[in-house]
Amino acid sequence: MRKYIPLVLFIFSWPVLCADIHGRVVRVLDGDTIEVMDSRKAVRIRLVNIDAPEKKQDYGRWSTDMMKSLVAGKTVTVTYFQRDRYGRILGQVYAPDGMNVNQFMVRAGAAWVYEQYNTDPVLPVLQNEARQQKRGLWSDADPVPPWIWRHRK
């Protein structure tokens, strides 16, 4: 019985562990990083579970432009649980209409599933659809994932 106590405490503390930010997107840095105004302070958000092409990489600017068209200047909701080693909030971003932006970017072929860290079971399904439909970066015969591209540089 004692071995279940930490699990029960974790489950009941879950709502406390996650938080939301509601704010206007003041900057789109790339296809997976935005800045949101939260209480008069810009907060950097890294979209969790996805990895978009780097700006200098093939499809990088296109991915950034896609993100801009979705959220730039708009009020979004960010649900998050933690920060990364750079201090960015790792968050799930929702557009004003409730659309899951992280999932949209993968579905459009504007980002990869960050498989090493992914916790969203829907994303691999969306990525397979995008690949089969040759959407976005999947129109390339052999797209290079950003984590490999960064390693080569």
Curated annotation (Swiss-Prot):
The UniProt family comment states:
Belongs to the thermonuclease family.
This protein's superkingdom?
A: Bacteria
Q: Does Ribonucleoprotein count among this protein's keywords?
A: no
Q: Which InterPro entries does this UniProt record tie to the protein?
A: SNase_OB-fold_sf, Staphylococal_nuclease_OB-fold, Thermonucl_AS
Entry GO MF terms: endonuclease activity; nucleic acid binding
One Pfam family from the record: SNase
Q: Which SUPFAM superfamilies match?
A: Staphylococcal nuclease
> So where's the catalytic machinery, residue-wise?
46, 54, 88
Give EC number(s), comma-separated.
3.1.-.-
Signal sequence coordinates: 1-19
Q: What is this protein called?
A: Uncharacterized endonuclease
Annotated source species: Escherichia coli
Keyword list (alphabetical) reads:
Endonuclease, Hydrolase, Nuclease, Plasmid, Signal
**Gene3D superfamilies reported for this sequence:** 2.40.50.90
